[in-house]
């Protein structure tokens, strides 16, 4: 499936949500590191073959970290610590931001996490923290342009 998806993305000039580099700091919890490295090798190989821009790393916030679900401030502190120690390159943070609603509460038990992810993206302190650490927020359109220059 990955190879076919990357070929189609290459045909249309789209980026793809996969990663091209492995780093233990951004290995999803429960994923053996060797599996991360193997998938990285395939995505890098096929992405290069078909000219598909992808982030270097894909970061999955781990909501099972003790204390992370206690409060928005605890969540924010944990995420900002991670973002302050990212590997060099382009990292996509995989989040599901959402506005609090009865519908959201009815479709997922993780509704509070999603609301906090939304709050974090609007938080001026977060924006200042990223600026202070040289982290720039970009879109996939900008990713495609950046990777095309390389």
Regions found by a protein language model. Name each.
Residues 3-150:
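Terminal accessory/targeting
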């Amino acid at each position: 499936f990955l190879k076919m998806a990357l070929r189609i993305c290459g045909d249309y000039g789209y980026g793809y949500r996969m990663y091209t580099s492995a780093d233990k700091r951004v290995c999803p919890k429960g994923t053996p590191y060797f599996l991360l490295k193997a998938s990285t090798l395939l995505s890098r190989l096929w992405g290069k073959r078909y000219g598909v821009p992808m982030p270097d790393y894909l970061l999955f916030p781990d909501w099972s970290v003790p204390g992370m679900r206690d409060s928005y401030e605890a969540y924010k502190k944990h995420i900002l610590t991670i973002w302050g120690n990212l590997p060099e390159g382009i990292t996509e943070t995989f989040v599901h931001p959402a506005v609090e609603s009865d519908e959201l509460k009815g479709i997922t038990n993780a509704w509070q996490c999603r609301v906090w992810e939304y709050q974090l993206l609007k938080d001026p302190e977060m924006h200042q923290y990223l600026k202070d650490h040289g982290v720039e927020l970009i879109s996939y359109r900008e990713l495609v342009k950046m990777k095309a220059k390389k």
